[in-house]
Curated annotation (Swiss-Prot):
Name by which UniProt lists this protein: Histidine--tRNA ligase
Cleavable signal peptide: none
Catalytic reactions on record: tRNA(His) + L-histidine + ATP = L-histidyl-tRNA(His) + AMP + diphosphate + H(+)
Subunit structure: Homodimer.
Organism: Salmonella newport (strain SL254)
Gene Ontology MF annotations: ATP binding; histidine-tRNA ligase activity
Length: 424
């Protein structure tokens, strides 16, 4: 017997019961994006490797350790996308969408990073991101955060996420702070773990989000990033905080909050949760005003965020399971008798025409009434339509409420109206 081929470690199958949950959550996210005027953009999964090296930074963990990179038959270096922003910017430049224009875009799809699989973090993961180009004020930063807050309300998880904010200033201000931070860390190398010692010279701001408690204690005495902000960044951040205060969105200023990718400047933010065990990030983003020019376009202000859907699905399942408890079908059509199958399929097609939003499944494969009602229960149907030879003969159908057990015979011509009343 041939050996079974299984999925690659960290790259998962999502089975029908799971995809129904994903579809409901994704539908909610997309509806909110549409209500703010954001448009979908669809991007390739594979890009040229230099795109990510230039955008993310050659000395980041993503580029150094986590990218799936390969050489194609032409000898070109290609990479499975580890994140979505770089590809979105590349597409905007390539198709002339950005210069002197305002764009609000969103994308969704799989991303790939070779890291240790764990709960909510996989080597193939799914991400939804939104990017805004051409607007530089704090008001659009605030809108993105308000949009995400609306998501949490729609999903029923607002009480389980909290917002952390920071400003990491201009590139020049960050360079000055970087020098001060490195000078401080050099004086305390005995406290640093090996990972922090490596980052101290390659990407020192990442030391700020070290999970090592000894390093975190040391950082209490480190120079504060806020003390190195330029005046424009300080004013921008104050404006953002004022808008969030007016909108009633609670937040914490976390001066150690930095993003793991090099292209960020000024605003950075994260929505975090403690409802999945240890604290985890649900959604994160910020401003990246220099990235478009860095990738070959003309200077264009930009801000955006990305969210890992695996972690979001886990959170909704954990704290609001009622949100995802939707049946596979609303109505199950039970048919028995030699002459009923054709009539049942004709009735089902007519009901799908008259009730396009309703999920209706017709029994196939035979079986007596008991077996067919068991199938209706398996698929979570609220209502069964029962069609036997006598109903076919007199043009009726029996409508049975599977929750209350009540049933009534209804003329087939008026059954759609009756079903709408039952389904609400």
């Amino acid at each position: 017997m041939a050996k079974n081929i299984q999925a690659i470690r960290g790259m998962n199958d999502y089975l029908p019961g799971e995809t129904a949950i994903w579809q409901r959550i994704e539908g909610t996210l997309k509806n909110v994006l549409g209500s703010y005027g954001y448009s979908e953009i669809r991007l390739p999964i594979v890009e040229q490797t230099p795109l990510f090296k230039r955008a993310i930074g050659e000395v980041t963990d993503v580029v150094e350790k986590e990218m799936y990179t390969f050489e194609d038959r032409n000898g070109d270096s290609l990479t499975l996308r580890p994140e979505g922003t770089a590809g979105c910017v590349r597409a905007g430049i390539e198709h002339g969408l950005l210069y002197n224009q305002e764009q609000r875009l969103w994308y969704i799809g799989p991303m790939f990073r070779h890291e240790r699989p764990q709960k909510g973090r996989y080597r193939q993961f799914h991400q939804l991101g939104a990017e805004v180009f051409g607007l530089q004020g704090p008001d659009i930063d605030a809108e993105l955060i308000m949009l995400t807050a609306r998501w949490w309300r729609a999903l029923g998880i607002s009480e389980h996420v909290s917002l952390e904010l920071n400003s990491i200033g201009s590139l020049e201000a960050r360079a000055n702070y970087r020098d001060a931070l490195v000078a401080f860390l050099e004086q305390h190398q005995e406290t640093l773990d090996e990972d922090c010692k490596r980052r101290m010279y390659t990407n020192p701001l990442r030391v700020l989000d070290s999970k090592n408690p000894d390093v975190q204690a040391l950082l209490n005495d480190a120079p504060a990033l806020g003390d190195y902000l330029d005046d424009d960044s300080r004013e921008h951040f104050a404006g953002l905080c004022k808008l969030l205060d007016a909108a009633g969105i609670a937040y914490t200023v976390n001066q150690r909050l930095v993003r793991g990718l090099d292209y960020y400047n000024r605003t950075v933010f994260e929505w975090v949760t403690n409802s999945l065990g240890s604290q985890g990030t649900v959604c994160a983003g910020g401003r990246y005003d220099g990235l478009v020019e860095q990738l070959g376009g003309r200077a264009t202000p930009a801000v955006g965020f990305a969210m890992g859907l695996e972690r979001l699905v886990l959170l909704v399942q954990a704290v609001n399971p009622e949100f995802i408890a939707s049946p596979v079908v609303d109505i199950y059509l039970v048919a028995a008798g030699a002459q009923t199958q054709s009539a049942a399929m004709t009735l089902a097609e007519r009901l799908r025409d008259e009730m396009p939003g309703v999920k209706l499944m017709t029994n196939h494969g035979g079986g007596n009434f008991k077996k067919q009602f068991a199938r209706a229960d398996k698929w979570g149907a609220r209502i069964a339509l029962v069609l036997g030879e006598s109903e076919v003969a007199d043009g009726t159908v029996v409508v049975k409420d599977l929750r209350s057990g009540e049933q009534t015979a209804v003329a087939q011509d008026s059954v759609a109206a009756h079903l709408r009343t039952l389904l609400g």
